[in-house]
């Protein structure tokens, strides 16, 4: 192989290798069961993707700043459990707080999003002003949030929280039927989140600031960017996205436990990297995040659909994450 051809091959591998791997996996899934591409399955994939897109948008903003968030999944779980206890139907015999009226959905959204924002602010404060790395900071908060959620879950009975008010069930499980295809309400919420983040990243000073911080924090500081304040804001905003995603996930599934959200952060990180959000910082697009989430959800759903052992699924997903990050590192090293 000539030096030129070898260089072209390596360039192609770095730029598109992960997509080749994912396409091969998809081809295997379809070969095993062609019914995988039914309209019902595609509807389910889109609905599952929608919640993950909201969560991944929160993670993506942090990766853009050279950060990450290992506590995302546990924040999703906390929001799900809190929302579930506040949105049970009054005629539910197992209602956690039987004397308390079912709260309005809008109020519960504000409550869980406020909780998410506070956790995000704590992460941001530790990272921006105590100079603790995002990995260690969010690893610690991941454990703390899970402990808080487990204590609350134990306090309210330590059993799956279900029996939601009909209004919330419609809010989270409703859909528009287009023949055999069902476009869920959750997908509309995800589209709103996508539009919001696209405008935030591309049309606001804040968006320019976070990309500047990710590209070169010192240069951003010299140019007048308040790095600490912007990190506080992006971590708080991420917490809001996790919380809203957790509330929707509880409604979509129809119940919540303290283990809901387990490993969601890894799926979100993997989807972001597959979608072109670089751990080197300062690189990423909203469309890339959406694409990465949909691709990863198709693989997850497909492996389950054809009956692949869940333990093998963990191995496959872990390998995809390592491969995607390795390719991202190679691309960054080449640019350096």
From Swiss-Prot:
Membrane topology: Multi-pass membrane protein
Segments on the Cytoplasmic side according to the record's topology features: 38-52, 202-226, 278, 327-336
A single GO molecular function term of this UniProt record: methylgalactoside transmembrane transporter activity
UniProtKB keywords: Cell inner membrane, Cell membrane, Membrane, Sugar transport, Transmembrane, Transmembrane helix, Transport
Signal sequence, start to end: none
Compartments (UniProt record): Cell inner membrane
Topological domains, Periplasmic: 1-16, 74-106, 149-180, 248-256, 300-305
Gene Ontology cellular component list: ATP-binding cassette (ABC) transporter complex, substrate-binding subunit-containing; membrane; plasma membrane
Domain of life: Bacteria
Function: Part of the ABC transporter complex MglABC involved in galactose/methyl galactoside import. Probably responsible for the translocation of the substrate across the membrane.
Family per similarity comment: Belongs to the binding-protein-dependent transport system permease family. AraH/RbsC subfamily.
Record's protein name: Galactose/methyl galactoside import permease protein MglC
Annotated organism of origin: Escherichia coli (strain K12)
């Amino acid at each position: 192989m000539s030096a030129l051809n070898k260089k072209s091959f390596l360039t192609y591998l770095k730029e598109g290798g992960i997509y080749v791997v994912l396409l091969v996996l998809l081809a295997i899934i379809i070969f095993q069961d062609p019914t995988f591409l039914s309209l019902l399955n595609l509807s389910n994939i889109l609905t599952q993707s929608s919640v993950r897109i909201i969560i991944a948008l929160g993670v993506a903003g942090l990766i853009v700043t050279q950060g990450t968030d290992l506590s995302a999944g546990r924040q999703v779980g906390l929001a799900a459990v809190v929302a579930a206890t506040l949105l049970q139907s009054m005629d539910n015999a197992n209602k956690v707080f039987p004397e308390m009226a079912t709260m309005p959905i809008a109020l519960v959204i504000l409550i869980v999003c406020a909780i998410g924002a506070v956790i995000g602010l704590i992460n941001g404060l530790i990272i921006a002003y105590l100079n603790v790395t995002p990995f260690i900071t969010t690893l610690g908060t991941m454990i703390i949030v899970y402990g808080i959620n487990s204590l609350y879950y134990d306090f309210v009975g330590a059993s799956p929280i279900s029996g939601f008010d009909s209004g919330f069930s419609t809010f989270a499980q409703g859909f528009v039927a287009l023949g055999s295809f069902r476009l869920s309400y959750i997908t509309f919420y995800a589209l709103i989140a996508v539009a919001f983040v696209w405008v935030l990243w591309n049309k606001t000073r804040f968006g320019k600031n976070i990309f500047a911080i990710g590209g070169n924090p010192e240069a951003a500081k010299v140019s007048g960017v308040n790095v600490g304040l912007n990190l506080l804001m992006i971590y708080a905003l991420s917490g809001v996205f996790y919380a809203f995603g957790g509330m929707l996930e509880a409604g979509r599934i129809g119940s919540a436990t303290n283990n809901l959200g387990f490993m969601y952060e890894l799926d979100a990180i993997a989807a972001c990297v597959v979608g072109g959000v670089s751990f080197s910082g300062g690189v990423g697009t909203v469309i890339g995040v959406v694409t990465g989430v949909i691709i990863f959800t198709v693989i997850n759903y497909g492996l389950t659909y054809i009956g692949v052992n869940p333990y093998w699924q963990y191995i496959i997903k872990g390998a995809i994450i390592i491969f995607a990050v390795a390719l991202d590192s190679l691309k960054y090293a080449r640019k350096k």
